[in-house]
């Protein structure tokens, strides 16, 4: 509802821009304004998977971490700068790209479904979990390595994200989401570690 969304406090301009549009849509729907026969706004969480190497530093941590780990080099994670969160225990909802595609395909085959939906796994996992999964899929032992969080990020750094999937499930989407470990294994073994990572 517009009231619920109005209480949200984005941490950065990117989040503010997404919320502003979602709020606009919610207000239009609440006012019974004309809408297309089907419409959907999807809020993707931390998407990872194959075919994102063109994104450079904006690629997922999985894609950035693997080539370093594969060479036997450490990939340092950000230290926590909060006393109540241990190093590496910062949590994100990492969602495999195939699952995002699955939601989109489902919407395309269910023209009666419209709305704003979160698209994530519904589980918050730690960066330590992610690092361990990348090392395991790369055939390397994991030894934690740390670096300080840049000062420019500290004020707006997210310590926890987790998709609330109730609206998506109530709309009828029932497919399970890929586990972090399985998604990382597919990404690395079937794509990133292959001679042609884009096949």
Where are these regions (language model features)?
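C-terminal substrate-binding subdomain of Rossmann-fold SDR/epimerase-dehydratase oxidoreductases
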Residues: 71-199
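NAD(P)-dependent short-chain dehydrogenase/reductase
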Residues: 23-102, 133-135
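Short alpha-helical oligomerization interface
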Residues: 2-10
């Amino acid at each position: 509802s517009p009231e619920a969304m109005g209480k949200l406090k984005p941490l950065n301009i990117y989040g503010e821009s997404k919320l502003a549009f979602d709020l606009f849509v919610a207000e239009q729907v609440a006012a019974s304004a004309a809408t297309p026969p089907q419409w959907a706004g999807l809020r993707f969480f931390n998407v990872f998977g194959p075919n994102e190497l063109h994104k450079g530093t904006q690629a997922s941590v999985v894609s950035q971490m693997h080539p370093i780990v594969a060479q036997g080099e450490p990939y340092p994670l950000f230290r926590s700068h909060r006393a109540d969160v241990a190093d590496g225990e910062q949590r994100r909802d990492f969602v495999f790209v195939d699952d995002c595609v699955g939601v989109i395909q489902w919407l395309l085959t269910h023209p009666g479904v419209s709305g704003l939906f979160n698209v994530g796994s519904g589980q918050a996992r730690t960066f330590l979990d992610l690092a361990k999964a990348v090392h395991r899929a790369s055939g390397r032992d994991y030894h934690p390595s740390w670096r300080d969080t840049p000062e420019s990020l500290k004020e707006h750094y997210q310590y926890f994200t987790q998709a609330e999937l109730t609206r998506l499930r109530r709309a009828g989407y029932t497919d399970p989401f890929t586990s972090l470990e399985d998604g990382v294994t597919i990404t690395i073994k079937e794509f990133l570690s292959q001679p042609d990572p884009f096949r």
